[in-house]
Swiss-Prot record:
Homodimer. Heterodimer with ARL6IP1. Forms multimers. Interacts with ARL6. Interacts with prenylated RAB1A and RAB3A. Interacts with SLC1A1/EAAC1. Interacts with RTN2 (via first transmembrane domain). Does not interact with VAMP1, VAMP2 or VAMP3. It comes from Rattus norvegicus (Rat). Changing K185A: Partial relocalization to Golgi membranes. InterPro entries: Prenylated_rab_accept_PRA1 (IPR004895). Regulates intracellular concentrations of taurine and glutamate. Negatively modulates SLC1A1/EAAC1 glutamate transport activity by decreasing its affinity for glutamate in a PKC activity-dependent manner. Plays a role in the retention of SLC1A1/EAAC1 in the endoplasmic reticulum. Induction: By methyl-beta-cyclodextrin. It is a multi-pass membrane protein. This is PRA1 family protein 3. It is found in: Endoplasmic reticulum membrane; Cell membrane; Cytoplasm; Cytoplasm, Cytoskeleton. Belongs to the PRA1 family. Keywords: Acetylation, Cell membrane, Cytoplasm, Cytoskeleton, Endoplasmic reticulum, Membrane, Transmembrane, Transmembrane helix. GO terms for biological process: cellular response to oxidative stress; glutathione metabolic process; intrinsic apoptotic signaling pathway in response to oxidative stress; L-glutamate import across plasma membrane; L-glutamate transmembrane transport; learning or memory; negative regulation of L-glutamate import across plasma membrane; negative regulation of mitochondrial membrane potential.
Length: 188
């Protein structure tokens, strides 16, 4: 299946005003996780543009440390995803505690980068855009178009770069299973 980049959402849709933002229910982790995954899929191109601008500014100020940090993060992330697919205990951890999995990757990257120097470049250049994405995805309420796009991604009608990343983190399987359960209940 072809991978398509999601369209760039309008600024008033991406950041519409305080009425479309709400604090997530921290007691219901699955609902919060669903909101984050849905928003990451729907606004992925906007997140990419914001991250690229921030990374470009930091990379312009300190290019060597930025490249070094990027290489280390990609290698650590790839290593953890590979290990999680080959080791059952890591696979269960990644599935049950996705936030902890991402935090372990970030901490491992931090320690490797601190051995080479340039920790602050990593923090501001790579981690800060990720933090902003997570905060926006957590607080932004979903609209009907967002939910429809996510269902199309979930059942395989569309494939996007963020969908591939979330599949690697095994964050879309649950939504596909829920959708399949819904269809089977609707048939009955």
């Amino acid at each position: 299946m072809d991978v398509n980049l999601a369209p760039l959402r309008a600024w008033d849709d991406f950041f519409p005003g305080s009425d479309r933002f709400a604090r997530p229910d921290f007691r219901d982790i699955s609902k919060w996780n669903n909101r984050v995954v849905s928003n990451l899929l729907y606004y992925q191109t906007n997140y990419l543009v914001v991250a690229a601008m921030m990374i470009s500014v930091v990379g312009f100020l300190s290019p060597f440390n930025m490249i070094l940090g990027g290489i280390i993060v990609v290698l650590v992330f790839t290593g953890f995803v590979w290990a999680a697919h080959n080791k059952d205990i890591l696979r269960r951890m990644k599935k049950q505690y996705p936030t902890a999995f991402v935090m372990v990757v970030m901490l491992a990257s931090y320690f490797l980068i601190s051995m080479f120097g340039g920790v602050m470049v990593f923090v501001f250049g790579i981690t800060f855009p990720l933090l902003l994405m997570f905060i926006h995805a957590s607080l932004r309420l979903r609209n009907l178009k967002n939910k429809l796009e996510n269902k199309m991604e979930g059942i395989g009608l569309k494939k996007t770069p963020m969908g591939i990343i979330l599949d690697a983190l095994e964050q879309q399987e649950d939504s596909i299973n829920k959708f399949a359960d819904y269809i089977s209940k609707a048939r009955e």
